[in-house]
Amino acid sequence: MQFEEAYKEVYEIVRPKYKLFTAGPVACFPEVLEIMKVQMFSHRAKEYKQMHVDTVERLKKFLEVEKGEVLLFPSSGTGVMEASIRNGISKGGKVLVTIIGAFGKRYKQVVETNGRKAVTLEYEPGKAAKPEDLDEALKKNPDVEAVTITYNETSTGVLNPLSELAKVAK
């Protein structure tokens, strides 16, 4: 109940004109707005380096990452898509793109714009990807270098069964 009361206080301060069902913008607590008034330090400064290391370590614990890495990107989601394709897929390489909404379509566009080939596994809006369909698509395209899956497709409100899909994609 305490959180709801605090959120109500913030809501009263910013009182948005419209309800946005997106990842942002969001209402901020007054304490956060106060901290945001402080001058930011450079991403090349030692303070940033320490903050980055601390943040990665905290995220590893929070996300229960025992193997692998946590990567932070100072960009939009599209920037992350582009970085993953440019750095993870060979020029002319093939990517299997699952499409269940606008963000899957964007990934396909990013793949093709960056000189890679996109093979799609597309569903009608409101439907999640199916592991058996992914398995079939991978058998038809054994030369794909990567599979893209939008976990939470906010454009349609669909959550993909990521654990099941990941087992097939491995």
Task: Name every feature range the model reports, one short phrase each.
Residues G88-K105:
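Conserved PLP-anchoring active-site segment centered on the Schiff-base-forming lysine
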Residues R106-K117, E124, E132-A137:
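Active-site-proximal loop->helix
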Residues I85-K91, T113-N114:
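Alpha-helix C-terminal capping segments
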Residues P74, T98, E122, T148-Y151:
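Short beta-strand segments
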Residues Q2-K46:
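N-terminal "arm"/small-domain region of PLP-dependent enzymes with the aminotransferase-like
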Residues P25, F29, L33, R44-H52, ...:
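Generic structural signal for well-ordered, non-membrane alpha-helical segments
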